[in-house]
Amino acid sequence: MEELDVDPAETPIPGLGQQNRHIGFSWGPGDLLLYETLYQKQGSETAARCPFMYLVRSDEDIYSPVLRKLFNESHSIFVGLQKSAEENAGKSRKAQLVQVSRNYRSVLRACMEEMHALSESTREPSQNTKYISQISILSAMELSWNLCEILFIESAPAGPLLILLLDWVRLHVCEVDNIVQDVLRSERPTEHEKFWDGVTGYVLQGRMNEARQLLAKEASSSVSARSMCRVLDDLLKKMPMLNTAGTQTLTEFELKWQHWREECERHLQNGTFSSNPHMEVVCRVLVGDEEVILEKRDLMTTWYHFLVSRLLFKHPTVKPTELHFYAQSSLDMFLAGNSSPEPLDNILLAAFEFDIHQVIKEFSIVSSNWWFVAHLTDLLDHCQLFQAHNLYFGANMREFLLLDYASGLFSHHSLWQLGVDYFDYCPNLGHVYLELHMERVPLNTEKKALKALRICEKRQMTEQVRSICKTMAMQSLCNGRLGSALSWSIRAKDAAFATLISDRFLKEYSERGNFTDLDLIDNLGSAMLLSDRLTFLGKYREFHRMYSQEQFSEAASLLLSLMTARIAPCSFWLTLLLDALPLLEQKQVIFSAEQTYELMRCLEDRMAAKLDSTSPDEIQKQDSVDSTKIEMLRLALARNLARAIVTEGALQE
């Protein structure tokens, strides 16, 4: 096993582990539950247990409202990228991948700006500190992502590479813009102490037009410096710059650049700017004097700005393969041994060395969540940069990081739905992970359960569908919602549970004399075949509907078939027989003699079954009401039998 690059971070938990007892724990998706057990450490004295349980979250970012927007919006970009990859397989997609990368960066920048606004509006110091920390992380993400976009996705060659790096520095180092704003707000800009810092700062970023505009203010306000300003302006104007259109070859550019540089050196040698130290400094920057450039580290603020400025004036046609040398030397020169590199410095150095695996590794160490590494790795995988890098347990790096990121989303009460799509696009282990996580989604509401159910049904996750339906059926049953419980048990195709709920419906009918949830029972359809008891419930309700519609003959036949089929619970037999009483008392004979004999047999079978299952002492205690009902039934059956025999005899004559 590889050794850890850094020691794991320690999280102190006040009050836990101070009573010399062993600590128990339970892992959750993104959470860790900690508690003190009954077991004491050896040699320790008996002490009271800590009465609290502690929930430790590994990723607090997921609960930030601003970062939730980042997760939501980047999800749609991710899904769009996967779909376009399927549609355009085999085609060159460089321009599209660059656009996708910019979309990700746009979302990052929007979140940063919103976080800035929150930081400025909040008055609570602790919350403000948290916002500043998150802004710092988001800024590092966008800075690193932008560099990876230039080096790995655009794969810019010598020449255009420097143009992109200049844009990168201008976007992320804005110190000079703040300086110039202060200068221009003053009454006399050219006399402002930071005026020449603004000119030099623009030059260091290759923004020659802006530098010339500031220089023009100096020329108009100082007659003595006007001629020098004109010479310096001419040098800035003449500085060769490669264009991204590629209309100029590198050889032509290098020739022009060499002539221009020689002209700058001549002016220095001739002492053109000797009377104005500020202009001389600018000219020394133009000829690539590294000592002078390094003296302006306060304007550049970062070593990577120094790197790009150094390349601009010394090696404008630097090749991608040479970047790592200049990057390392620029870092060493900028820090000058006064401080050690920060984690962000290591990430950028790894990028300049084109070691994308080290970039991912370094950012995984410093980041509090997997968003950056998961999405960047996925994007670079579409650039065919990870094909040869498989992890020891089978999954490639892209899938491993996406699985971890999606697992983290499942710990959130609403973001778990985003995690489903990430699992979908992990071909090796995604389906297995999704099955395990869907079983652990808390089904707090029926709406959430229906969402989870649709997800599982769409992906043919049969066991998870059954599990969700059973869970919701039990919740509904515990809450006394029999209709909902029956509906969920039918969806789960759980015959045993459907039988249990059907019995509850029948018990409720016996106690109240009517059914609840009639719409559900009336529309069971083929679902009633799930269990015998459910079939009985549906048919018994159909009998009541026929009776209410005065379809007495059909109702009588159905009632008799329900009794002879013996699918009703024993406790319900007397209720069925009593339901026959109104039909037996009709003026018109409903039950034939044969049907009446069947009813009599059912009554006697019921009595015999009751005698077999009841002790003699209990028989004596039987309620007289039941006895009265049975006597009424026997009398009604006898009368109906006599009427039926007479009627049938008359019909035969």
Swiss-Prot record:
InterPro entries: Nucleoporin_Nup85. The keyword tRNA-binding does not apply. Disruption phenotype: Morpholino knockdown of nup85 results in abnormal pronephric development characterized by underdeveloped to completely absent pronephros. Keywords: Membrane, mRNA transport, Nuclear pore complex, Nucleus, Protein transport, Translocation, Transport. GO terms for cellular component: nuclear membrane; nuclear pore outer ring. It is found in: Nucleus, Nuclear pore complex; Nucleus membrane. One of its GO terms (biological process) is protein transport. Pfam families: Nucleopor_Nup85 (PF07575). Component of the nuclear pore complex (NPC). Component of the nuclear pore complex (NPC) that seems to be required for NPC assembly and maintenance. Involved in nephrogenesis. Belongs to the nucleoporin Nup85 family. This is Nuclear pore complex protein Nup85. It comes from Xenopus tropicalis.
